[in-house]
Amino acid sequence: MALWQQGQKLYLPPTPVSKVLCSETYVQRKSIFYHAETERLLTIGHPYYPVSIGAKTVPKVSANQYRVFKIQLPDPNQFALPDRTVHNPSKERLVWAVIGVQVSRGQPLGGTVTGHPTFNALLDAENVNRKVTTQTTDDRKQTGLDAKQQQILLLGCTPAEGEYWTTARPCVTDRLENGACPPLELKNKHIEDGDMMEIGFGAANFKEINASKSDLPLDIQNEICLYPDYLKMAEDAAGNSMFFFARKEQVYVRHIWTRGGSEKEAPTTDFYLKNNKGDATLKIPSVHFGSPSGSLVSTDNQIFNRPYWLFRAQGMNNGIAWNNLLFLTVGDNTRGTNLTISVASDGTPLTEYDSSKFNVYHRHMEEYKLAFILELCSVEITAQTVSHLQGLMPSVLENWEIGVQPPTSSILEDTYRYIESPATKCASNVIPAKEDPYAGFKFWNIDLKEKLSLDLDQFPLGRRFLAQQGAGCSTVRKRRISQKTSSKPAKKKKK
């Protein structure tokens, strides 16, 4: 691949740039398929914020959160294969390729309700029924709304990327005064389990730009709302972060309100005429915003509880699970019902209603089940393949224990027996323990090392896959078995 350099006046032949190879050029598929699935995955918590109860904590479990599953697959190079002639361990390495995936969700459909007991909504700017020219020091109100409706399903072998806006460091020459608006910049981060989706108030770091703590619903008050950076992931040269994605977003503006506060960037008299009293100062801010609404939730527009077949990925990685890892990013607030639990405060049954005699609690529950169809593949260890993987994803070669061997040393080495003893010198050239590159991130870890099966017809997704291949559940899948053939004709038995 060759690109023209920007700013050059003489158009010389561009400098060639190394191309990223499609995984299909060096990965051979074996047509051996496995089914893998999880148990029923459940999570329960408070829908708005974590709650401390003694030494324990009720986690925050909101329908507006991402669920990011880090799926560990077994190493196929240490796998008990049905046919030992499938590959040559001295010349090849085995990898997994994703063929199908299904994310199943339980629980009934329900709108996601959020809000704030002291929300900064000064006036109704939609219905003009009275004139207000002043604001008090505190005009906050109890407000509830249904969040923007979102469904997201994104699969890759590295974590998905999210984007958000946050405050930036101003230039040295631009000295900000107290109370001035800070500059903003767009940043990226891995989408982790529990990160908040964008629910109609923008993708931003609200902990940094929301000093009033009243401009947003409670569940995103001190959070970073992320939006998947589809543009960046689509341009990823390796194509590891996004094999494919499915999404559905739905929102409309239900109410239009005005924010309270001192507007330092108020419109000038170029945009309006002053009143007959000669007062040109606007008493009410012109900062309008719309309260989002996700509207109708229906089974007609669900992207879950259905299979997805991966024939061609959008990037150069056609579904290969490098390092035996998959990252499944899910966002779904169409099952956002929150339970209200009321308990008598003194433990005795109530005979008449008295709000001071019972406690109320808030809980949200989620239910998932994941299923995959995996194909066994092999990668031939050639100089070109090793060079390509070294530049693309060096950790793959490290896990395969492939590297440049140092020359044999002619110096006599010393080996101490009790190297950890206080009587022995401190050990040198100690090989550090292998670190998990995702140790500092939060994911829902799923171990499928012992969950793979060749009997596809015993599972719902497996039967659907067989139907795609034109085979029914009654069809016996023949496994390839190496047999020695003889050139001598078979002798007929005498009757």
UniProtKB/Swiss-Prot annotation:
Transmembrane segments: none annotated. GO terms for biological process: endocytosis involved in viral entry into host cell; virion attachment to host cell. GO terms for molecular function: structural molecule activity. The keyword Disulfide bond applies. Forms an icosahedral capsid with a T=7 symmetry and a 50 nm diameter. The capsid is composed of 72 pentamers linked to each other by disulfide bonds and associated with L2 proteins. Binds to heparan sulfate proteoglycans on cell surface of basal layer keratinocytes to provide initial virion attachment. This binding mediates a conformational change in the virus capsid that facilitates efficient infection. The virion enters the host cell via endocytosis. During virus trafficking, L1 protein dissociates from the viral DNA and the genomic DNA is released to the host nucleus. Self-assembles into homopentamers. The capsid has an icosahedral symmetry and consists of 72 capsomers, with each capsomer being a pentamer of L1. Interacts with the minor capsid protein L2; this interaction is necessary for viral genome encapsidation. Interacts with protein E2; this interaction enhances E2-dependent replication and transcription activation. The gene is L1. It holds the Pfam family Late_protein_L1. One of its GO terms (cellular component) is T=7 icosahedral viral capsid. It is found in: Virion; Host nucleus. This is Major capsid protein L1. Keywords: Capsid protein, Disulfide bond, Host nucleus, Host-virus interaction, Late protein, T=7 icosahedral capsid protein, Viral attachment to host cell, Viral penetration into host cytoplasm, Virion, Virus endocytosis by host, Virus entry into host cell. Belongs to the papillomaviridae L1 protein family. Coiled coil: none annotated.
